[in-house]
Structure formats: structure tokens, C-alpha cells
A protein has these predicted regions:
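Short, flexible, glycine-rich and Lys/Arg-enriched loop motifs at helix boundaries
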Residues: 1-2, 42
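Conserved nucleotide-sensing/catalytic segment adjacent to the nucleotide-binding pocket
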Residues: 2-31
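Short hydrophobic/charged patches on amphipathic alpha-helices used for structural packing
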Residues: 15-16, 37, 72
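Acidic, Mg2+-coordinating active-site environments of NTP-dependent enzymes
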Residues: 19-23, 27, 45-188
């Protein structure tokens, strides 16, 4: 798609094709634009992950408050049976999830994180880090470079863990996630 989140007709067509092909899960990035324009209106998400909020897209939203309000739409409309997973280290995360009716799970480096990130180490081949969840440490590595990718992977880890996936499947998925062309890509 040319858009981060496709137009609703295109998105529903893709999701239907995936369903007909036997797909049980879909993972997608839901942009603030798509929330404001109701591209995902009517979809019921089992999980939503909030990674961070920085002053972007103000040309579209007009100001930071409108941008924050757009981001909140996904969380405010989650079904009670869903889970909201959020980066507790982000200054705006509490504002984003405060009105969310679903279960809430935090990730980050703060001591009160439910999925606590520690020991982040980056080099040109990727990022390694540890997540502590329910008093168990999980040593993880991704080929994606940067502390922010440890945070992104922690959100994915939390989602997968809460979905009931096996630890080795989660670790393998994080380890084999390919680089996205043009996104903090290492060039040789």
C-alpha cells in the first residue's frame, strides 16, 4: 500500500483475502491519519500497542492535542476483552491509554513495567536486550539496530506472549524480523 494504513475499502478487501487464505492473525500499523479518517472504523482489535508520540504530522492534525486525540481513538474504542500494551517510558502513554476500557499492560525500562526492558546493547548487526516478565528473563536479539527497536520488539513480545505463543516462537520471530527498506537501514 502507498499509505501506512490502507483506505478502508482496500484494507477490508486485504483482510478478507487473508481470512479466505486461512490467516488467523493480522498485524498492522494504524496511523494517526487513518484513525482521524476512520479507515479502521468498525474493525475489532484484540491488541493495540502504543510505542511513542512525537510532534509529527502537525500539518495534518493542526496541533499536538489533535494528534494525541487521534492516537487515542484506537485505544478508547478497544473492546473490553482486548489488551492495550503501552510504552510506559513515553511521556504521553498514560494520556493515550487512560480512557481505554480494556486490560492494560506496560513495557519499558521503568521498574514498574510489566514487561521490563534491560541490558539494551546495539551494534551494526542488531540489538540485544532482556525482557523480564512475571519474574522470568527473556534474552532477545533483533537484526534491527537501535534502542527504539528494542522498545518496538518489546511491544511485539508482549502481544505475542499475551496471545499465548510459545517463547521459542516469539524469540525466533523477533530474531528474524527483516529490516524495512529505508527505515534506519544499514547501507554497505
Amino acid at each position: 500500500s502507498k499509505l501506512t494504513t490502507p483506505e478502508s475499502n482496500d484494507l477490508n478487501k486485504m483482510l478478507n483475502q487473508m481470512n479466505l487464505a486461512g490467516c488467523d492473525f493480522s498485524v498492522m500499523e494504524v496511523s494517526s491519519h487513518s484513525l482521524a479518517l476512520k479507515r479502521v472504523h468498525g474493525l475489532h482489535f484484540s491488541f493495540a500497542v502504543f510505542t511513542n508520540l512525537t510532534p509529527e504530522h502537525l500539518d495534518f492534525h493542526g496541533d499536538f492535542e489533535n494528534y494525541l486525540t487521534a492516537k487515542k481513538i484506537l485505544f478508547d474504542t478497544l473492546p473490553v476483552s482486548s489488551s492495550a500494551i503501552y510504552n510506559i517510558d513515553d511521556l504521553h502513554s498514560i494520556d493515550v491509554v487512560k480512557d481505554c476500557p480494556s486490560l492494560k499492560y506496560s513495557f519499558g525500562t521503568k521498574s514498574d513495567s510489566q514487561f521490563k526492558i534491560s541490558e539494551i546493547n546495539c551494534d551494526l548487526t542488531g540489538t540485544s536486550f532482556t525482557i523480564n516478565y512475571e519474574n522470568k528473563n527473556y534474552a532477545l536479539r533483533t537484526s534491527l539496530v537501535g534502542d527504539f527497536n528494542a522498545y518496538n520488539a518489546a511491544g511485539a513480545f508482549a502481544t505475542a506472549k499475551l496471545s499465548g505463543l510459545k517463547d521459542e516462537v516469539i524469540a525466533a520471530g523477533i530474531a528474524t524480523t527483516p529490516q524495512v527498506p529505508g527505515r534506519f537501514e544499514i547501507l554497505s
